[in-house]
């Protein structure tokens, strides 16, 4: 079983809809994980999020930073729901012998992404807003923030390959980060999108 179900959104959506993000994601994870309790030994891959790591975790973030500090406030409700799923997976393994592996992908992008201005993640959000600015012949573009934060991105098909690989291997840990290993600043990312879109 692969659990990739989640209510997701970008920083604005997480910051303004925290209650909904927490409740909906708790419901999703509890419903799925509770449903396997009385089944024969189940193998389940649970997709989490890199936002489960502390705000001040050293980069590159590794699994040893898990539960090592305060979460980033704007998406802590989403992170708490994901942390609850990890803990529930541990108890299901201990109490019922199920094999639960939690994969923490970095920031994803790819086909069928959400390009809504207020609810998208960083790459589709920048693409959408910059494209709209170009169509309106606007000279300035606000990337939101300083542009200095570093982010790691992973193409969604690469995550699919990682899931296939992990599902076939004997894994002795219940928490695995999946990423590209390459970080880029938001400003550099915006510059790449600017060149691709042709925004002057």
Question: Where are each of the predicted segments found?
Answer:
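Conserved catalytic-core motifs of eukaryotic protein kinase domains, centered on the activation segment
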Residues: 11-19, 55-60, 112-115
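Conserved beta-loop-beta element that borders a ligand/cofactor-binding pocket
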Residues: 48-49, 86-114, 124-127, 135-143
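C-terminal substrate-binding subdomain of Rossmann-fold SDR/epimerase-dehydratase oxidoreductases
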Residues: 126, 132-200
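Active-site helix of classical SDR
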Residues: 77, 81-84
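NAD(P)H-binding glycine-rich loop region in Rossmannoid oxidoreductase-like domains
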Residues: 1-25
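Hydrophobic positions on the long internal alpha-helix
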Residues: 28, 32-36, 88-89, 162, ...
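Structural signature of the Rossmann-like NAD(P)-dependent dehydrogenase/reductase core
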Residues: 3, 43-48, 101-107, 142-145, ...
């Amino acid at each position: 079983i692969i659990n990739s179900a989640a209510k997701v959104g970008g920083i604005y959506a997480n910051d303004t809809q925290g209650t909904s993000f927490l409740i909906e994601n708790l419901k999703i994870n509890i419903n799925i994980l509770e449903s396997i309790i009385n089944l024969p030994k189940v193998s389940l891959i649970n997709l989490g999020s890199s936002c489960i790591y502390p705000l001040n975790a050293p980069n590159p973030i590794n699994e040893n930073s898990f539960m090592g500090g305060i979460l980033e406030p704007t998406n802590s409700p989403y992170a708490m729901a994901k942390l609850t799923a990890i803990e529930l997976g541990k108890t299901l393994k201990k109490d019922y012998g199920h094999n639960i592996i939690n994969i923490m992908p970095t920031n994803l992008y790819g086909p069928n992404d959400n390009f809504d201005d207020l609810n998208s993640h960083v790459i589709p959000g920048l693409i959408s807003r910059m494209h709209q600015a170009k169509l309106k012949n606007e000279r300035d573009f606000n990337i939101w923030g300083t542009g200095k934060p570093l982010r790691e991105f992973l193409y969604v098909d690469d995550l699919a390959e990682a899931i296939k690989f992990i599902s076939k291997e004997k894994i002795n840990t219940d928490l695995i980060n999946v990423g590209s290993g390459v970080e880029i600043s938001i400003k550099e990312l915006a510059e790449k999108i600017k060149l691709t879109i042709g925004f002057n």
